């Protein structure tokens, strides 16, 4: 039992570590691509535009990493958080968002105000679905974490951040549907993406410490012999 728990902790730490490193890599890659030709305007042009050009493969890789790290986060979340602190709907929505990110990595966008090709249309629609599903999924997960005692960071903070992320994502979606001439579209999109990554990064850092923190939920002391006590963890359970 003890050995399986140790292995479980190791696997969970590995997954969460991969998520944390993945987020840093996503940010680094986007900065690098932004600095390379053809130097798209980050304020007015979408992140996806960076995937069109001589170094577009780097942005495509960036999108793939973003989708994979979300999937890894889902697996780690399920392993570390007890069932009463999980939201099945939230995890499903986050999974849909991850698949959408992987899809848009292979469906290039069109560098036009409105999509003009099949792959451009697929990219635009799937990207909007990804924004909404990810933001709503994060909010549902944040609400479910209120059932986990001593959760760090505070579920109240996570709910607030998730609400801001969802509202901002809706604004991004509305701006696309209403008009394609908004000159700060690129900035709006990047802020929405950043808010989502900040939420995932914050929770990942908290969960990375979760299994080993003293005083976390489910940790209790039971006697093993007269005058002796043995510390045992009931939650979280690792399988």
Segments the model singles out, each with a brief description of its role:
Residues 4-211, 217:
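Hydrophobic, aromatic-enriched alpha-helical segments typical of multi-pass transmembrane helices
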Residues 1:
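Short, conserved interaction/coordination micro-motifs, predominantly
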Residues 212-238:
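Short, highly charged, low-complexity non-transmembrane loops/tails of multi-pass membrane proteins
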